[in-house]
Amino acid sequence: MIIAGHDTSTALLAWIFALLGQHPETHAHVVSEVNSKDRSPLLDHIIKESLRLYPPIHIGNRRVAENMEFAEGTVPAGERMFYSIYLTHRDPSVWENADDFCPERFAHGRKTPPMSYIPFGGGPRACIGAAFGQAEARIVMARLLQTFSFEPMKAAKIHAHMGATLEPRPGVMMKVLRIPPNF
């Protein structure tokens, strides 16, 4: 579980920085929010939207409860079936502008159909570390954004590599500078 938490957290943080690098207005807005005394709802929305677009664990599986009939054949009860969390999160019948980075979609407590937002799986076997992972991302991102400035180094096309986790490739290259402390 420690390894799973490490790799998924790393992938999530990398995707957040990749997305903020592509959306400088959102980046500037979240930096302003984390530096204010108030709670930053935008950071939570950015984390949720990053998890929607690029869920670190991009495939899930379920045991089929009853026979499932398809035009191509039958999946018998008891078999394991894999599903794509990545594609579920990009379903245009659920998500308006499904491929666009839009943290504001989480701003108003928008309800989605059951099992349409499942970055940590769902049901009784959902990831035990979900709350910890989101809290960790929030704390780490807030501290990094308060302490350093981040600028994309080059406009290299980043693509999603589907390995054990969904990772940005060739990586996220950023110029990182320490922000002088205000005393």
Q: Locations of the language-model features?
A:
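Conserved cytochrome P450 catalytic core segment spanning the I/J/K helices
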Residues: 1-13, 27, 44, 63, ...
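Cytochrome P450 catalytic-core helices
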Residues: 6-33, 130-147
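Conserved cytochrome P450 K-helix E-x-x-R motif and the immediately C-terminal K′/meander segment
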Residues: 37-71, 92
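Conserved cytochrome P450 K-helix/beta-meander segment immediately N-terminal to the heme-binding cysteine loop
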Residues: 67, 83-110
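Cytochrome P450 proximal C-terminal region
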Residues: 126, 131-183
